């Protein structure tokens, strides 16, 4: 019979953690109780889920989804996030696609590394995942006098209602995932 275990598939058949079991159970419950999400959630599963404590009293649940299922998750993203945030009260839910970074090839090696497996490409894609459903309309990198750098990311103002309440969480999650400082803003319309 179907169960919440079918909603999580980890690498090398590793045992799911307590957090991952909670998320899988929530997805399974949504599939069984929510009629509008039932057909879309039927074939979807997750790879990993992590609870993160962000600065202050904010908490987030970061859910990793397989690259193949990225489009399907994005199609139902706003509704799914709304339902999951109800279940995990007080926690922001962020979906991130599972991606791998390959190390640069050794000198003299004949192998080519695909562009989408480079560190830069994976971090940029993670930034898009964290900011979703808002679209990134611009980026500026600011170098400070002490040598540190901070990236300003401008989000599309159309999705302001869906994303504004969790900007602080998005900054904290991106910093924990990549180690880079980022600031999310909405461009000022003149």
UniProtKB/Swiss-Prot annotation:
Disulphide linkage map: none
Signal peptide: none
PROSITE patterns, sorted: RIBOSOMAL_S7E
UniProt KW Ribosomal protein keyword: yes
Chain coiled-coil ranges: 17-50
Single GO BP term: translation
Cellular compartments per GO CC: cytosolic ribosome; cytosolic small ribosomal subunit; nucleolus; plasmodesma; plastid
Family membership: Belongs to the eukaryotic ribosomal protein eS7 family.
Protein name: Small ribosomal subunit protein eS7x
Organism: Arabidopsis thaliana
Primary gene name: RPS7C
